[in-house]
């Protein structure tokens, strides 16, 4: 008896106490409904996305930990613009436009997997991804928006989200 790990993919906030999840949880002697409820709480902010969940169970104490791997930045950006795939020619063929605040929201969602220390740095990372798949921001090339972020033009917007960034 030791540590067991169960890896499973679920739709954010929509895990069900059914196969393949339920039998694996039952076999470890855990309350299936409670674990599924906890998984749904942990994945709620990724509603509409398929996310990888790692359930780490101590077989001796029956205590468990849930780790959620967020969707990729590309998946989040594509869903935000309603596109199914990136542009094959992002410099000339745009697939959509997003408001700057949506970029900030995606940066906050991605905080656990980004190496950015500040919200501003995280936003610049997401802007780079948006540019590489053919998305404009507020009708502008994300490279221009990145320059404007560096110049402080978006400081007021970023300040509104700072508390949310700290909690993420």
Curated annotation (Swiss-Prot):
Residue ranges crossing the lipid bilayer per the database entry: none
BP term (GO), one: translation
Keywords assigned: Ribonucleoprotein, Ribosomal protein, RNA-binding, rRNA-binding
Record has Cell division as a keyword: no
GO cellular component: a single term: large ribosomal subunit
Protein origin, superkingdom: Archaea
InterPro entries for this protein: Ribosomal_uL11, Ribosomal_uL11_C, Ribosomal_uL11_C_sf, Ribosomal_uL11_CS, Ribosomal_uL11_N, Ribosomal_uL11_N_sf
SUPFAM superfamilies reported for this sequence: Ribosomal L11/L12e N-terminal domain, Ribosomal protein L11, C-terminal domain
Xref: Pfam families: Ribosomal_L11, Ribosomal_L11_N
GO molecular function, one term: large ribosomal subunit rRNA binding
Quaternary structure and interacting proteins, as annotated: Part of the ribosomal stalk of the 50S ribosomal subunit. Interacts with L10 and the large rRNA to form the base of the stalk. L10 forms an elongated spine to which L12 dimers bind in a sequential fashion forming a multimeric L10(L12)X complex.
Similarity-based family: Belongs to the universal ribosomal protein uL11 family.
Function: Forms part of the ribosomal stalk which helps the ribosome interact with GTP-bound translation factors.
Protein known as: Large ribosomal subunit protein uL11
Origin organism lineage: Archaea, Thermoproteota, Thermoprotei, Desulfurococcales, Pyrodictiaceae
Encoding gene (name): rpl11
């Amino acid at each position: 008896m030791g540590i067991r790990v169960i890896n499973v993919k679920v739709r954010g906030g929509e895990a069900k106490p059914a196969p393949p999840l339920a039998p694996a949880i039952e076999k470890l002697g855990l309350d299936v409904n409670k674990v599924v409820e906890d998984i749904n709480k942990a994945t709620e902010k990724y509603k509409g996305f398929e996310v990888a969940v790692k359930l780490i169970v101590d077989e001796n104490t029956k205590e468990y930990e849930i780790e959620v791997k967020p969707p990729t930045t590309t998946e989040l950006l594509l869903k935000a613009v309603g596109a199914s795939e990136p542009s094959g020619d992002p410099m000339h063929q745009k697939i959509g436009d997003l408001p700057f605040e949506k970029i900030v929201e995606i940066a906050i969602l991605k905080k656990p997997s980004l190496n950015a220390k500040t919200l501003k740095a995280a936003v610049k990372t997401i802007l780079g991804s948006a540019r590489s798949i053919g998305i404009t921001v507020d009708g502008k090339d994300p490279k221009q928006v990145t320059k404007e972020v560096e110049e402080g033009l978006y400081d007021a917007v970023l300040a509104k989200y700072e508390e949310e960034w700290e909690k993420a």
